[in-house]
Amino acid sequence: MAETEKERLLKQLAQLKNERTSFESHWLDLSDFINPRGSRFLTSDVNRDDRRNTKIVDPTGSMAQRILSSGMMSGITSPARPWFKLATPDPDMMDYGPVKIWLEVVQRRMNEVFNKSNLYQSLPVMYASLGTFGTGAMAVMEDDQDVIRTMPFPIGSYYLANSPRGSVDTCIRQFSMTVRQMVQEFGLDNVSTSVKGMWENGTYETWVEVNHCITPNVNRDSGKMDSKNKPYRSVYFESGGDSDKLLRESGFDEFPILAPRWEVNGEDVYASSCPGMLALGQVKALQVEQKRKAQLIDKATNPPMVAPTSLKNQRVSLLPGDVTYLDVISGQDGFKPAYLVNPNTADLLADIQDTRQTINSAYFVDLFMMLQNINTRSMPVEAVIEMKEEKLLMLGPVLERLNDEALNPLIDRVFSIMARKNMLPEPPDVLQGMPLRIEYISVMAQAQKSIGLTSLSQTVGFIGQLAQFKPEALDKLDVDQAIDAFSEMSGVSPTVIVPQEQVQGIREERAKQAQAAQAMAMGQAAAQGAKTLSETQTSDPSALTAIANAAGAPQQ
């Protein structure tokens, strides 16, 4: 009997499960000690409120993860300020007014879609998973109400595979849906016989395991435009139930899963290193140290006691101010601690603080909390800015990978969805068929460009100082180019800078006005001179009369 499509998908799922097995023990440790609620290795864990933080005594690792997630959110994709802009591959085209305006309008509309959707609720969750487990995943789906709808996946609930380029192009997610949700989403005719029976019996809230498989559609017919022949194939199917029944088969024009990795080794699908993995050993050591400190204090304040046998079955009190009576017999020491504990916790506290600092360094806490931890009031503003820029550069490699594996696909996906929904204005003719370039202008992206800004500012300042003694030094500075370069590196809105052709028109008009004013001034001066000559008295001897007489005398 031929293999059904569902059986083939289940076989692929089993292979991906086997590939992921070696990572799971590490992820479980990270989950137990840093982010207990950030994983889901069993679909049956849905809506389970079991206590999971039993291995955490000191939550320094968990708080460091929170700071990293919040810092990346505010520093990379802050909803409070623009963090990306669209540009053309040809920089000269950016000086063309209609292109500038169109790109600005598109960027503003995309930001409105981001703010309206739940994107900014999902990104911190993905950043937390990325920092602790090294791998994050989030789906970006079309939505009739908010244009897009995002859903972050907990670690352990999905399986990934790479394309030949090394980027993720396959994702199978396992999750749970209630019988009611399945019937509402897929229809009663598409669910399995067992789910249909539960629906008819009224057990609407029973959970059923569902799989969602997204893979490249290698067998598609590119000449057809239906959902089953799109570049990426999407299939929903139950783990159990009928062996030949799929819940839904459709497709995507773009890969809808964002799957950034912190650091990847070779051909690995999942991350090989991240702050959580670096800090895990210290996080475990910190729990032991905190237990030892508590035991030390406990033994000092409530020590084990020794007593003579005469006190056996007698009333003994350890309450403050209470009295225990006993007969002291020669050779007996009475009722006393078994051993004296000197609670000198200074060395232990110093080691605990050192361990905490190591954990915070692994999570870049010192970077995100720099202005809070350092007294910057006594420092020059330039020194504070340079220190901040230097620390932000430490995240440079991670930021580049995040751009490539998460932010670029996110913007491409949302742009395409908005284009299909006719939410974008008609582009200028010069942009027809031209790919756009994405530039990031977030706080961290600006830190990467700050070296160029500083160099440009220093160069312009140097030329200005020279011009005080040698004004012709300004001839060496192209002011228009300096303004354009500075505004581009600063991330200023393109509409703030006047296009070059408009500047040229303004200058030509100003030159014409200056010429007209000069001609008018010369005309007025000539008229005034003629008037003066006409009013001059020639009866008295003067130079003027001499000239006039000489001009009128007959020539010999």
Swiss-Prot record:
UniProtKB keywords: Capsid protein, Viral capsid assembly, Viral genome ejection through host cell envelope, Viral genome packaging, Viral penetration into host cytoplasm, Viral release from host cell, Viral short tail ejection system, Virion, Virus entry into host cell
InterPro entries for the chain: Connector_podovirus
Any one annotated GO CC term: viral capsid
Biased composition (Polar residues): 533-542
Presence of the UniProt keyword Transferase in the record: no
Key word DNA-binding present: no
UniProt subcellular location: Virion
Main location: virion
Spans annotated as Disordered: 527-556
A GO biological process held by the record: symbiont genome ejection through host cell envelope, short tail mechanism
Family affiliation: Belongs to the podoviridae head-to-tail connector protein family.
Subunit structure: Homododecamer.
Physiological role: Forms the portal vertex of the capsid. This portal plays critical roles in head assembly, genome packaging, neck/tail attachment, and genome ejection. The portal protein multimerizes as a single ring-shaped homododecamer arranged around a central channel.
Protein name: Portal protein
Lineage: Viruses, Duplodnaviria, Heunggongvirae, Uroviricota, Caudoviricetes
